[in-house]
Regions:
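Conserved Nudix-box catalytic region and its N-terminal flanking loop in Nudix hydrolases
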Residues: 28-74
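Active-site segment of metal-dependent pyrophosphate-handling enzymes
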Residues: 70-109
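NUDIX/MutT-family hydrolases
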Residues: 100, 111-143
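Short, charged, intrinsically disordered terminal tails
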Residues: 146-155
Length: 155
């Protein structure tokens, strides 16, 4: 009886795991790439967000870039995706997968956006963008995109 009770308690304490699927984009304009800042400019990252019902990752990436930056881009190629975990409170863990895409700049201005999630959006040369990115997994995505753009790998 004690074994059942102990097992039941352990099951109740285990956080619930939720899977999320997001998509994001790296927009290139000349020799610069577009990053967003969150948390009042404390964290620099790539624009991304959750897929909407029936939306493809490719379409979600274009939409999220436009919503978060005011910039429109055309998808050139897929980039490596990333996976990570984070917690929402003590009882919920999120396992997130993000598909990334390389986008060519088409139009728009990084000051023409309305987003509660983003403090600012700004263009950076490749090296500065790599130095500013907060998360190592996004630095790997940008480094991969740079190799692709500079012709070191085929699309």
């Amino acid at each position: 009886m004690a074994e059942r009770t102990t097992a039941a308690v352990k099951r109740r304490r285990r956080p619930r795991v939720v899977r999320q699927h997001s998509a994001g984009g790296l927009v290139v304009r000349g020799g610069e790439v577009l990053l967003i800042a969150t948390a009042g400019g404390a964290r620099w990252q790539l624009p991304k967000g959750r897929l909407e019902e029936g939306e493809t990752p490719r379409d979600a990436a274009v939409r999220e870039v436009r919503e978060e930056t005011g910039v429109t881009g055309n998808v050139v190629a897929p980039l490596p995706g990333i996976d990570y975990w984070f917690a929402e409170g003590a009882r919920k863990r999120i396992r997130k997968h993000v598909d990334y895409f390389l986008l060519d700049y088409v139009s728009g201005s990084e000051v023409d956006f309305d987003s509660r999630e983003v403090s600012t959006a700004r263009w950076f040369p490749w090296d500065e963008a790599l130095a500013r990115l907060t998360h190592a997994n996004e630095r790997r995505v940008v480094a991969s995109a740079r190799r692709l753009v500079e012709g070191e790998v085929a699309p």
